[in-house]
């Protein structure tokens, strides 16, 4: 029988983009959570993903990319608990934390992100480093600064893989860098954006391997179609998102990949007292992207208030297309919107302005 269960009327798990925007929304609205409400996050600060490439390229300092959580939580009546969620039992309304705490909640909001996908077999003969979660990646990157790796393989031909590749070139000018894409580079974006990205990678002396999905890792080597193609010192996973293991066994209605299925009000389809947003959630026409998570934040903030008050919930409507800005490590950026694509310093200035404005709003 469990003892020392802590009761909380509202619990927010994870300081992702949607939760940060929700908290700022509450500050503006003058809303304070009921006594005993909690924010659970592994660290006392949240990393802003949009500025990570700039940090790696030396354009920003770590503190510029972090949102301190204590003051923001205190402003809306939340107690910050620095721990990691280990288990959720949705039916009983219980959370088990890594530090041994058990919390019983009335309303729960999950914005805990995701982990890097590993879509192949490996024998652990190479170090695998996920681009997410950010704290682990940043810690390893900082340790590499004093002893740069001989060769790195970056897996993932999306925006994250591209941005990491060109940023890591600045950090490690003498390291061999290889970027592997299972499809064409930046598939899903306009073809012109991919052409611009290829030119940037060539200029940065990053070797690009398109349409080469990794089959596995054995004896320190990467395999494509059962043939060894590379023997790097480490592998960085920018291969998209995977659900944390606990989501598959928590009792919530999840999709085939373990992401929590939600309705347009951002509620779990199976448990209406549980909300989910950002990378941990599954909603039609809503990619796992910070742009969409930020837009969810205002609706989520209003709906958590409404859930507690018993009033009507608002509906989140994903935008049909989103502006994409890919940092190029030198202050410029690639830009696409719909079928349009361009590049240059002006796009980089726009990205910096948007990122720094977001950080000013959060601090």
Regions found by a protein language model. Name each.
Residues 2-78, 152, 163-191:
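Beta1-alpha1 glycine-rich phosphate/pyrophosphate-binding loop at the start
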Residues 2-11, 75-151, 236:
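FAD-binding core/adjacent interface of flavoenzyme oxidoreductases
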Residues 18, 113-116, 241-243, 331:
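Short glycine-rich anion-binding loops that position phosphate/pyrophosphate groups of nucleotides
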Residues 37-39, 108, 177, 235, ...:
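Hydrophobic/aromatic residues located in beta-strands of well-ordered beta-sheets
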Residues 80-87, 103, 173-264:
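A Rossmann-like FAD-binding core segment of flavoenzymes
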Residues 126-148, 229-234, 238-295, 302:
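FAD-site-proximal beta/loop scaffold in flavoenzymes
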Residues 280-329:
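A conserved FAD-binding loop/helix module that cradles the flavin
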Residues 330-363:
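C-terminal auxiliary extensions adjacent to catalytic cores
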